[in-house]
């Protein structure tokens, strides 16, 4: 599938180490390194990143950006240290919403909102927000959520995720001003044509 993405002109791939997210450690480093090498894509990876050793392993494997979720809630001091060491372009904060931030592979709900968490990160540049309430439904993205985030957080590049079921959803998110959109199930189930998606991407 990655070869197909690359053949159509894709440049970025978002990956989640689901085993790592549940285990609380990066669990699939060999597979990730192999995919980076064979695909030729810029790959960002999340799931189970808890230590500086995890981060070092991923960057040594060729990963371009890491996606930090649970730890950005539980240990802002460490994550802010990563911003200083690796730079804002290398880190995406993952703030998943329903309506409070969920952590540990969405198994635990914190007492914090997206805005509570992001207040701790003055160096942040990229924020991924999945609305868990619509994730996997293919019924449309949460436009009101992202509109509110863009208004409150104009300094950040917002990446939307969850609910995207058609190319029209992506047009709507683009019109709002989000920086990027994670699309997965809609491609695999044929709701969005890969060539059409990448043609849109090349125009924007």
PLM segments and residue spans:
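Short, acidic/polar
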Residues: 1-6, 51-56, 108-120
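Conserved, mostly hydrophobic/aromatic
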Residues: 5, 13, 58, 93, ...
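Glycine-rich, proline-tolerant flexible connector loops at the mouths of alpha/beta enzymes
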Residues: 12-30, 130-138
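Conserved beta-strand positions in the central sheet of alpha/beta enzyme cores
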Residues: 14-17, 44, 67-68, 92, ...
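Catalytic cores of alpha/beta
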Residues: 31, 36-39, 43-66, 144-183
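Active-site/ligand-binding-proximal alpha/beta "capping" segment
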Residues: 31-34, 111-159
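Conserved anion-binding
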Residues: 63-135
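C-terminal helical cap(s) of enzyme catalytic domains, especially alpha/beta-barrels
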Residues: 77-86, 91, 171-176, 180-204
């Amino acid at each position: 599938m990655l070869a197909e993405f690359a053949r159509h002109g894709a440049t970025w791939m978002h990956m989640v180490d689901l085993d790592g997210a549940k285990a609380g450690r990066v669990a699939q480093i060999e597979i990730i390194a192999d995919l980076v090498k064979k695909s030729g894509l810029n790959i960002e990876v999340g799931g189970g990143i808890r230590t500086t050793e995890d981060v070092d392993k991923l960057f040594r494997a060729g990963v371009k950006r890491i996606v930090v979720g649970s730890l950005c809630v539980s240990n802002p001091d460490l994550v802010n240290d990563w911003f200083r060491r690796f730079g804002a372009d290398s880190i995406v904060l993952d703030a998943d919403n329903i309506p409070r931030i969920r952590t540990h592979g969405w198994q635990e709900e914190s007492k914090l909102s997206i805005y509570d968490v992001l207040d701790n990160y003055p160096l942040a540049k990229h924020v991924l927000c999945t609305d868990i309430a619509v994730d996997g439904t293919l019924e449309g993205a949460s436009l009101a959520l992202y509109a509110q985030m863009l208004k409150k957080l104009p300094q950040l590049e917002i990446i939307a995720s969850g609910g995207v079921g058609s190319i029209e959803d992506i047009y709507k998110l683009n019109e709002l001003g989000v920086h990027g959109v994670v699309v997965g199930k809609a491609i695999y189930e044929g709701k969005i044509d890969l060539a059409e998606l990448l043609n849109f991407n090349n125009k924007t």
